[in-house]
Amino acid sequence: MAGNKKSDKLRRLVDVQRQLEKLAEFELSTTVQRKAEIDQSIDTTVDALSSTDPVHQQFSKNYADRLTRLFSRSQQIVAQQKAQEQRVLREKTKGDRLEERMGDAKEL
């Protein structure tokens, strides 16, 4: 009977841990989407900067400044993405361990 109580508690913990894992995955997907948007902005800015159109040439200094900011933001996003990937892995590992412990508690 005591094993059943422990198993129920661990099952609830596993459920919560899986929710945390899904939350971490959602945050990671949002970061990946932002990275793609920044990469698209970088491509657009590079195209405008290398354009021979006189209008774009007038704004070359502004484009260069924007490109610098975009590269900086891109590096920040990459670091954030790596941290979130580690968090997803850590949350998944915790959930797997709790699931194993729950299975062991059921056997008792």
Where are these regions (language model features)?
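Charge-rich amphipathic alpha-helical interaction elements
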Residues: 1-108
